[in-house]
Swiss-Prot record:
The keyword Transferase applies. The lineage of its organism: Eukaryota, Fungi, Dikarya, Ascomycota, Saccharomycotina. GO terms for cellular component: cytoplasm; nucleus. Keywords: Aspartyl protease, ATP-binding, Cytoplasm, DNA integration, DNA recombination, DNA-binding, DNA-directed DNA polymerase, Endonuclease, Hydrolase, Magnesium, Metal-binding, Multifunctional enzyme, Nuclease, Nucleotide-binding, Nucleotidyltransferase, Nucleus, Phosphoprotein, Protease, RNA-binding, RNA-directed DNA polymerase, Transferase, Transposable element, Transposition, Viral release from host cell, Virion maturation, Zinc, Zinc-finger. The capsid protein forms a homotrimer, from which the VLPs are assembled. The protease is a homodimer, whose active site consists of two apposed aspartic acid residues. This is Transposon Ty1-JR2 Gag-Pol polyprotein. Retrotransposons are mobile genetic entities that are able to replicate via an RNA intermediate and a reverse transcription step. In contrast to retroviruses, retrotransposons are non-infectious, lack an envelope and remain intracellular. Ty1 retrotransposons belong to the copia elements (pseudoviridae). It comes from the Eukaryota. It comes from Saccharomyces cerevisiae (strain ATCC 204508 / S288c) (Baker's yeast). The active site is at D461 (for protease activity). Residues 299-401 are annotated as: RNA-binding. GO terms for molecular function: aspartic-type endopeptidase activity; ATP binding; DNA binding; DNA-directed DNA polymerase activity; RNA binding; RNA-directed DNA polymerase activity; RNA-DNA hybrid ribonuclease activity; zinc ion binding. Mg(2+) 3 binds at D1610, E1652, D1685. Residues 583-640 are annotated as: Integrase-type zinc finger-like.
């Protein structure tokens, strides 16, 4: 019938029914679906643009690609449609032809089915008021916009209006599915509005604006039946039509009511998902709001259970309410009412109104009577999510009900109004719920596992062989199947909870199902295309649809990110609950070995390898079923996390394929590891490993060195072993090109035995992957075993040996066999194996007497190679033994005290495991001979020499049961604690890191959270977990709430003992030692400053500028804001990249802290703030607590101690006493005595030069009339006190000249021979740096002078005598001094007064008050350092005039006039300066360091790896008492004095970034332990590696002619011994660093704020003095700034409140600081911690941070 109608009217152009019609929609105030006209116009424009890109074809030529666009010439064409929803906009005239729409208005052209025929129906005629369609496509139509009102006056007026102007509108699309009915109703209502029928549409209250006429009712009925076929109507619509088939108005009214209801539901869901509460509003109001939402959703059929509601509420809690999030683990069945009780309690406590307000808490009986229910009893409503977003929505209602622009797939709920056409509601973060997700427990637990996941969709995976889903709500017929093994792309096991069916209901009303696996341990829900293909469903990515083989489209595919997704709305939900799924395969594990015990027993191998080994019987005695694997899924071994931590996975498959063709033991891989430093001489420093290519069997051999003969012995041993044991001959050995393998000796040996050496390419470690990976694996195991057992590091090779034995017995997942099985050996009997470090008692077969103990405490290492015994370490004898006479010590976990292992008791498991072996031993033990306690023949560990160090005792912490421990566990724990506790001795020789230095550790600290990648944690999956250090050293039974409330901070250590050989004209407020203050971690400091008010002031400033630096005006500051901002304008602060805040999901916050340990070595401060993990020592001592077994000294006689060296006289040095005794740093002696330079000098040429210098000096002394040559005095006649010893010293200068100097021994001069009040002044280094900086900024000329024999120009007042020079040969005579000889106490002061008088009186200079040796006049500035002068002037002639006057009195030499405009090089007071006027200045010491450092006899490594920083955080100087021989001690102290003396000289000259490390080591000069010496060597090595670094200055270009002096201050709280704080200050002049200080605070500070105040108060005096100096030298105005990262300190400075000062010291410091800031017009500014370059002065920093803070001024 339809085809006939089309053929009858073939002369009519079959264009769009709305062709070239432009109409504005009529807005009705009562319209609940108000869509703006702009959207309609945009839709029309978008459609026009899209269709204009299509090729226009004649009606008879082609068939459109869209199956819905049937050609009008085709007899089988369906009801005309204008394509899918996105193209249902109005079309132009040229685009009408290919479309299938027939025009509306002709009765025969209306396609309808017979059921639509009704007696009421009649076709609209030409006079009808309804819109007509054009009779000719070529006639352009223009319809004026109707008026805004929709009310018709009467039918006649309507007729006249429609007659005068014909209106053509776009018809609605055809309804094609019941699920699309809600969307279709919206377009149908829009169609009625455009047809001037908006007034008949029911409003919100269900009533239309006006009455409907009969014609309108007929039009409504017919159009509804035409475009809404009955087979596609929802059930509820059919029910209405079955009663009255003309009641279209009721259908519209009910549809609008559903739309309004769904809008409120969507808003409630969004509000519930975005709850936020921090206590700013009353708790009552918050509870009322939440309960109203939940009740409203429950009434609408969307039921929210208690658990989901509690999770949503707790997720929005912040501030002090945030800790309630953790209650979900303590109370699994918490209700909303209970949660609000806790919220009310915190709110009342916060408001302090518990006594004034009635208690809100309800009785339990009230809770039982609560009528509200939050259980989920019905299926949750599905709310689809539309990924397309409309940008011009104007209201929330409009967004929720916007007309769709896409054809969405069907929903599973036919009775609900789908929101697939709505714009997605944007929530606050990725954890919030979105429209389209089910508000269920599964949604809350699995929302957004990945950032690129499309919520509510399945990921189509072509590589997955199985379908996996996280939610159990879609699994039908679920059943347990624990035998299924599923691995991911990285071959890691994925635990499976259950298997079931996944049922689909596609849009063609077909149903199908596939198998699905349930697991919560995946990032996406995966839909396998392979399983879909098995049910005849394929994915077409060109059309982006799922379809059958016959082309039937089932569902659309969405491309989101890099993946393709299909909506979950096609899944049929099941009625199975999550707990059912999660518990379906819970198995009985009674009497099974716990997995952590087996994991530790088998050398911390991973679970997969252990299961393979048990399945293939490579581990005997028990089966796989004897192990409880339930904990293996989520088990995280802390020791594995630390011991096996790695950066990335090794690249596999790097070996050549031909290697697989070799027979067993014909192709070996070998490699050498080492050296391991800081071990006793008897312990090996290297090991060499061998791996067979075919069987993967491994051997390891210890080495003490890498000499040729040592390597040859090992090769001879391994070849003989393989030949005799396996009857095989080695053909090829693959090795790297190390010298130990390429030497001629080994090459001849291999050639003699017919073995081909296969060398890898140089620096190609991947080609040597087998050996390299084995070494890495063994080292991981070694670190883990030592970490777990707590044994000292010198037993490292025993851990390697133990790991090798175990790994040879573990099956390979690839070959399914172990190396022993491949080699034809029996499996390892685990009953003969003990955990590494297992405490045992060894029988003493030869005690000293019959009453002495017969048992010796020891620790099991590994099975013996040479007997049936076990290698056991005996700490009391400091050796290892090979014996079978041992008993396992019960109740002793070898190394579990800090990782919560104490809750695991393996005694019973160990007894069961070793029962058969022990019975075998017992049955065969008839009589034990005296030599049964056989000493091990392993020469590498038989006798451990530990004489320089002694084992340390560390107090063990008793682990008390926590709140979550069951009562039974409490009892067991208490019993276990009461037993004796054997602990391994603490490490004697701690490892020294290459890049860490710092003082002894006093306390633990709060670390920063970081992501740790578990690469071998013993579990079966990878998890990012934060490692948290212990909050304190107290027992672990402290309450969790108390631990949260405490504010534990990072502290960072530095110390300084500053040596200043010049007078410092600055009065220090903190005593003689300048100290520095503690520092909180960078992130914690920012949080506390920004989000909390300081304890001193209730309202600190909180505003930050765009540069993260906040200038804060003091009360007396009157400068403008731009002046304050200019303070930080040109400072050399680091450029920080923008960082987005890292947010950790709740599961990370809920993990219990894993306490880690601190390795005792290198400088790292006491709790560094930048250390990601602060680790506490886990080394144990046999004398840890009172209950442990004690071994008295008289128990062992000399026979037992024969392996130890005889006692020697030693000096015992205590760390604190040594640090407190340090007074000064002894400078390096770079000169030679007379006998060294001349008498015994074997270098003839050098000797002649020194003789020449000697005579030159003598002549100069005679010329200057240094002594009275007229009379010689007899020694007996002169008072010995007035006789000064003298000597000649010789030196070779850097320019190559040889110089001699006759000096007096002022160090032994009697006090009566000089005036102690006289001062020998020289220019202060800050004055020199200030003058140089001003010279650069003002284009000054710099002239350097030298006055020869300067001291000899000064007369001496006292009566002093010296011995004549040696060449005169008058040893018994004395001569009287007339001039100030070099070396006399008063010589410097005499010369200073002489030159000062001459400069003032003869040269017209004046000395700057407070700055000795700085002279100036209106044109010239002079800096005087003994006999060196540096002149600065704008005009070079001014310098020349001064030089001429100086030459008139003194022998003046011009070193550098400085007249060139090019770069000029100076050597001023040891500084090598490169200066180009008006451009830059560079200060360094490269040449000096290149000459001096090699003379220190420090082991330098010029070709090795360069250190990137002078020290690293996290490692500490050991406080153990030091025992050294007297001579050895003096020698090491002298060496430390030389090294620290040089480092101090460099640091205070220009390397201010090293001051913290220098000062810390300077405190340990009298404590020269091996660790301290190694740290000092590291510092010298770093100085050597960076000797070319320079302090860079550039000429400043200020906007105003002013000088800017800034000090940047920082402090580290309580990080020094005796809880002193470290303070640091850096001074900058016009953006150039001119000085720095890093010192220890003189007084103990009690808070971080107090430490910061102390640091600032220490900096202000010098700041003021420098300010005065600058104003004297340069008359420009000066701006003074003070920068700190402590907002609390700033608030104290600007506050007028004195009530909160906690004590007198703090108050006086703060008040003085206020006075200094206000009185000196200081601009106090806030600087972000990450940009605070003074951080390097107070703590050790990570490499990246250290470089970031220093690379702008030191490079």
């Amino acid at each position: 019938m339809e085809s006939q109608q089309l053929s009858q009217h073939s002369h009519i152009s079959h264009g769009s029914a709305c062709a070239s019609v432009t109409s504005k929609e009529v807005h009705t105030n009562q319209d609940p679906l108000d869509v703006s006209a702009s959207k309609t116009e945009e839709c029309e424009k978008a459609s026009t643009k899209a269709n204009s890109q299509q090729t226009t074809t004649p009606a008879s030529s082609a068939v459109p690609e869209n199956p819905h666009h049937a050609s009008p010439q085709t007899a089988q064409s369906h009801s005309p449609q204008n394509g899918p929803y996105p193209q249902q906009c109005m079309m132009t005239q040229n685009q009408a032809n290919p479309s299938g729409w027939s025009f509306y208005g002709h009765p025969s052209m209306i396609p309808y089915t017979p059921y639509q025929m009704s007696p009421m129906y009649f076709p609209p005629g030409p006079q009808s008021q309804f819109p007509q369609y054009p009779s000719s496509v070529g006639t352009p139509l223009s319809t004026p916009s109707p008026e805004s009102g929709n009310t018709f006056t009467d039918s006649s007026s309507a007729d006249s209006d429609m007659t005068s102007t014909k209106k053509y509108v776009r018809p609605p699309p055809m309804l094609t599915s019941p699920n699309d009915f809600p969307n279709w109703v919206k377009t149908y209502i829009k169609f009625l509005q455009n047809s001037n029928l908006g007034g008949i549409i029911p409003t919100v209250n269900g009533k239309p604006v006006r009455q409907i006429t009969d014609d309108e009712l007929t039009f409504l009925y017919n159009t509804f039946q035409i475009f809404a076929p009955s087979q596609f109507l929802p059930t509820w619509v059919k029910d209405i039509l079955s009663v009255d088939y003309t009641d279209i108005m009721k259908i519209l009214s009910k549809s609008i009511e559903k739309m309004q209801s769904d809008t409120q539901e969507a808003n409630d869901i969004v509000t519930l998902a975005n709850l936020q509460y921090n206590g700013s509003t009353p708790a009552d109001a918050f509870e009322t709001k939440v309960t109203n939402i939940i009740d409203r959703l429950n009434n609408n059929g969307i039921h929210i259970n208690n658990k989901v509601a509690c999770q949503l509420i707790m997720r929005g809690l912040s501030g002090e309410y945030k800790f309630l999030r953790y209650t979900r683990h303590r109370h699994l069945n918490m209700t909303v009412a209970e949660l609000f009780l806790d919220i009310h309690a915190i709110y009342e406590e916060q408001q302090g109104s518990r006594n004034s307000k009635p208690n809100y808490r309800r009785n339990p009986s009230d809770e039982k009577n609560d009528s509200r229910s939050y259980t989920n009893t019905t299926k949750p409503k599905v709310i689809a999510r539309n990924p397309q977003k409309t940008n011009n929505s104007k209201s929330k209602t409009a967004r929720a009900h916007n007309v769709s622009t896409s054809n969405n797939s069907p929903s599973t709920d036919n009775d609900s109004i789908s929101k697939s056409t709505t714009e997605p509601i944007q929530l606050n973060n990725k954890h919030d719920l979105h429209l389209g997700q089910k508000l269920t427990e599964s949604t809350v637990n699995h929302t957004n596992h990945s950032d690129d996941e499309l919520p509510g969709h399945l990921l189509l995976d072509s590589g997955a062989s199985r379908t996996l889903i996280r939610s159990a709500h879609h699994i039908h017929s679920a059943s347990s199947n624990p035998d299924i093994n599923v691995v991911d792309a990285q071959k890691r096991n994925i635990p499976i909870n259950a298997i079931g069916d996944l049922q689909f209901h596609f849009q063609d009303n077909t149903k199908t199902s596939i198998k699905v696996l349930h697991t919560p341990n995946i990032a996406y829900d995966l839909l396998s295309l392979n399983e879909l293909a098995a049910v005849d469903i394929t994915a077409c990515f060109t059309k982006n649809v799922l379809e059958r083989s016959d082309g039937t489209v089932l569902a659309p595919i969405v491309k989101y990110g890099d993946f393709y997704w299909v909506s979950k709305k096609y899944l049929l939900p099941s009625n199975i609950s999550v707990p059912t799924i999660n518990n379906v395969h819970t198995s009985e594990s009674t009497r099974k070995y716990p997995y952590p015990f087996i994991h530790r027993m088998l050398a911390h191998a991973n679970a997969q390898t252990i299961r393979y080994s048990l399945k293939n019987n490579t581990i005997t005695y028990f089966n796989e079923s004897d192990v409880d694997w339930s904990s293996a899924i989520d088990y995280q071994c802390p020791d594995c996390l630390i011991g096996k931590s790695t950066k990335h996975r090794h690249i596999k498959g790097s070996r050549l394929k031909y290697q697989n063709s070799y027979e067993p033991f014909q192709y070996l891989h070998t490699d050498i590891f080492g050296p391991v430093h800081n071990l006793p001489k008897s312990a090996p420093s290297y090991f060499i490993s061998f791996t067979d290519e075919t069987t993967k069997f491994r051997w390891v051999y210890p080495l003490h060195d890498r000499r040729e003969d040592s390597i040859l012995d090992v090769f001879t041993t391994i070849l003989a072993f393989i030949k005799n044991q396996f009857q095989a001959s080695v053909l090829v050995i693959q090795m790297d090109r190390g010298s130990e393998y390429t030497n001629r000796t080994l090459h001849k040996f291999l050639e003699k035995n017919g073995i081909t050496p296969c060398y890898t390419t140089t620096a190609d470690s991947r080609a040597h992957g087998v050996a390299e990976r084995l070494n890495r694996t063994l080292l991981d195991d070694c670190r883990t075993q030592l970490q777990c057992s707590g044994l000292p590091n010198h037993l490292w090779f025993s851990a390697i040996e133990f790991s090798t034995i175990v790994r040879n017995s573990l099956a390979s997942p690839k070959s399914k066999k172990s190396a022993r099985q491949h080699a034809g050996l029996a499996g390892l009997d685990i009953s003969t194996l003990l955990p590494f470090g297992q405490p045992v008692i060894v029988n003493d077969h030869n005690p000293n007497s019959k009453i002495h103990p017969r048992g010796i405490p020891g620790y099991a290492l590994h099975p013996s190679r040479n007997s049936y015994g076990y290698i056991i370490y005996l700490p009391s004898l400091k050796k290892t033994v090979d014996t079978t006479n041992y008993v396992i010590l019960q109740g002793k976990e070898s190394r579990l005290d800090q990782f919560n292992y104490d809750a695991l008791t393996f005694d019973e498991d160990l007894n069961r495991l070793t029962a058969s072996y022990q019975s075998f031993i017992a049955s065969n033990e008839i009589q034990q001979s005296d030599d049964l306690n056989i000493e091990s023949d392993h020469d590498f560990q038989s006798d451990i020499e530990l004489h320089p160090e002694q084992p340390r005792n560390v107090l063990s912490k008793a682990v008390s049961p926590t709140d979550s421990t069951p009562p039974s566990t409490h009892t067991e724990d208490s019993k276990r604690v009461s037993k004796t506790n054997i602990r391994a001795p603490r490490e004697v020789d701690p490892n020294i890191s290459e890049s860490n230095i710092l003082p002894s550790k006093k306390r633990s600290s709060t670390p920063q959270i970081s992501n740790i990648e578990s690469t071998g944690s013993g579990g079966m999956h990878k998890l990012n977990v934060p490692l948290l250090a212990p909050m304190s050293q107290s027992n672990t039974h402290e309450s969790s709430h108390a631990s949260k409330s405490k504010d534990f901070r990072h502290s960072d250590s530095y110390s300084e003992n500053e040596t200043n050989h010049t007078n410092v004209p600055i009065s220090s407020t903190g005593g003689t030692n300048n100290k520095t203050v503690p520092q909180i971690s960078d992130q914690e400091t920012e949080k506390r400053i920004i989000h909390r008010s300081p304890s001193i002031d209730a309202s600190p400033p909180e505003n930050n500028s765009s540069h993260n630096i906040v200038p804060i005006k003091t009360p007396t500051t009157v400068s403008e804001q731009n002046t304050e901002e200019s303070i930080i304008a040109d400072l050399p602060l680091p450029d920080l990249p923008p960082e987005s805040p890292t947010e950790f999901p709740d599961p990370f916050k809920e993990l219990p802290p894993i306490n880690s340990r601190q390795t005792n070595s290198s400088l790292g401060g006491i709790g560094d703030s930048n250390a990601y993990t602060t680790i506490n020592s886990k080394k144990r001592s046999l004398e840890d607590n009172e209950t442990e077994i004690k071994v008295s000294r008289d128990t062992w006689n000399t026979k037992n101690m024969r392996s130890l060296e005889p006692p020697r006289s030693k000096k015992r040095i205590h760390l604190i006493a040594a640090v407190k005794a340090v007074k000064s740093i002894k400078p390096i002696r770079t000169t030679l005595r007379y006998d060294e330079a001349i008498t015994y000098n074997k270098d003839i040429k050098e000797k002649e030069k020194y003789i020449e210098a000697y005579h030159k000096e003598v002549n100069q002394l005679l010329k200057m009339k240094t002594w009275d040559t007229d009379e010689y005095y007899d020694r007996k006649e002169i008072d010995p006190k007035r006789v000064i010893n003298s000597m000649f010293i010789f030196n070779k200068k850097r320019d190559g000249t040889h110089k001699a100097r006759f000096v007096a021994r002022g160090d032994i001069q009697h006090p009566d021979t000089y005036d102690s009040g006289m001062q020998s002044n020289t220019v202060h280094h800050y004055a020199l740096m200030t003058s140089l900086s001003l010279a650069l900024d003002n284009n000054y000329y710099i002239t350097q002078l030298d006055i020869s024999s300067a001291y000899l120009y000064a007369d001496i007042k006292e009566e002093l005598y010296i011995r004549p020079p040696p060449h005169l040969g008058m040893n018994d005579k004395l001569i009287r001094l007339k001039k100030s000889l070099y070396g006399l106490k008063q010589s410097g002061a005499n010369w200073y007064e002489t030159i000062k008088s001459y400069l003032i009186q003869q040269c017209g200079m004046e000395e700057v008050r407070g700055w000795s040796c700085v002279f100036k006049n209106s044109q010239v500035t002079i800096c005087l350092f003994v006999d060196d002068m540096v002149l600065f002037s704008k005009n070079l002639n001014s310098n020349k005039r001064i030089i001429e006057k100086l030459k008139m009195q003194y022998d003046t030499k011009i070193i550098n006039l400085g007249e060139s405009d090019e770069e000029i090089q100076y050597d001023i007071l040891g500084l090598e300066i490169k200066y180009q006027r008006g451009k830059y200045m560079k200060l360094g010491m490269e040449n000096s360091l290149t000459e001096k450092i090699p003379k220190l006899n420090v082991p330098l490594n010029p070709k090795g790896r360069k250190l990137s920083a002078p020290g690293q955080p996290g490692l500490y100087i050991d406080q153990q008492e030091l025992e050294l021989e007297e001579d050895d001690y003096k020698m090491k102290v002298h060496e430390m004095q030389k090294l620290i003396g040089l480092a101090s000289y460099v640091g205070y000259k220009f390397r201010f970034d090293l001051l913290y490390y220098i000062n810390t080591l300077a405190q340990h000069i009298l404590f020269p332990s091996k660790q301290v010496l190694d740290m000092t060597y590291e510092l010298i090595q770093f100085i050597w590696n960076t000797r070319d670094k320079q302090l860079i200055w550039h000429k400043s270009k200020p906007v105003k002619p002013t000088n800017k002096l800034v000090v940047i201050s920082d402090a580290s709280y309580g990080n020094q011994p005796y809880y002193k704080s470290q303070i640091g200050n850096i001074y900058l002049l016009n953006g150039k660093v001119i000085g720095g200080k890093s010192t220890k605070a003189s007084l103990t500070c009690t808070s971080t704020t107090e430490a910061e105040i102390h640091a600032i108060s220490e900096s202000v005096p010098l700041l003021n003095n420098l300010s005065y100096l600058i104003q004297e030298l340069d008359k420009k105005p000066i701006t003074k700034g003070l920068l700190t990262d402590s907002k609390s300190t700033i608030s104290i400075i600007i506050s007028n409140n004195e009530e909160k000062f906690r004590n007198r010291f703090f108050g006086t410091k703060a008040m003085r600081l206020r006075d200094e800031v206000s009185g000196n017009h200081l601009h106090v500014c806030y600087i972000e911690t990450k940009k605070n370059i003074a951080d390097v002065m107070t703590k050790p920093l990570p490499i990246k941070t250290f470089k970031l803070l220093t690379n702008k001024w030191i490079h």
